[in-house]
A protein has these predicted regions:
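A mid-sequence, solvent-exposed acidic-amphipathic segment
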Residues: 94-129
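FMN-binding flavodoxin-like domain, especially the glycine-rich phosphate-binding loop
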Residues: 1-107, 166-187
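Iron-sulfur cluster-binding cysteine motifs and their immediate structural context
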Residues: 114, 123-147, 151-168
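Generic preference for hydrophobic/aromatic residues in regular secondary structure cores
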Residues: 111-114, 161, 182, 186
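Charged, low-complexity surface patches
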Residues: 28-29, 117, 145
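Short linear motifs in intrinsically disordered/low-complexity regions
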Residues: 116, 135-137, 143, 174, ...
Length: 188
């Protein structure tokens, strides 16, 4: 998301080696690795490796049923060993990563809302990584800050934060998805 790229642009790599990583819900990560590689290099990092790692999809669980699994963990451990070997050897070539220039335009993200069962405990505001939920406005997240990570949904003790059933159904229909987000122009 743009927030991650904004924060990455504040870093100063000073030639330090780095590995760019895209964690995704076993669906698609589009231009993420390329964008991160570009931003990391601009910030002065030497990108020596890149990986896309599967994780549980934060909205549509069917995409990652049973993932990550033991094979995924084994693959990550082997990748880590190869990175260490590469760094130790001094053969620090820049990886070729998938993606498009110009980057594909991202669609609108899905913003979780609190329903009437919200107890106003404030945990969502405390734990939101992007500051999209204000302690003063718990039920109205700032759409410009929300990165659709679903942290608020996963930690709500009363399960009051949700994506609407309509949006969840639409997201499950891959024909309306563009770059991992819903393209409303494709919704009937």
């Amino acid at each position: 998301p743009s927030l991650a790229l904004e924060r990455l642009s504040m870093l100063k790599g000073n030639g330090a080696m780095c590995v760019v990583t895209a964690v995704y819900g076993n669906r698609a990560y589009e231009d993420t690795l390329l964008q991160m590689q570009d931003y990391a290099q601009t910030a002065g990092f030497q990108v020596i490796a890149a990986i896309s790692a599967v994780a549980e999809h934060s909205i549509i669980r069917k995409y990652t049923a049973g993932r990550p699994n033991l094979n995924d963990y084994k693959g990550l451990a082997e990748f880590g060993d190869r990175i260490l070997e590469k760094a130790a050897s001094g053969a620090l070539s820049t990886p070729v990563v998938p993606g498009n220039r110009p980057y594909k335009k991202a669609g609108a993200g899905m913003i979780p809302q609190a329903d009437a069962t919200c107890t106003a405990c404030g945990l969502c505001a405390q734990k939101c990584p992007s500051g999209a939920i204000s302690a003063d406005q718990l039920k109205l997240p700032d759409k410009s800050k929300c990165i659709s990570c679903m942290r608020c949904v996963s930690i709500c003790p009363v399960h009051a934060r949700k994506i609407s059933q309509l949006m969840t159904s639409v997201a499950a229909d891959e024909s309306v998805m563009v770059d991992g987000k819903i393209d409303m122009s494709k919704v009937n």
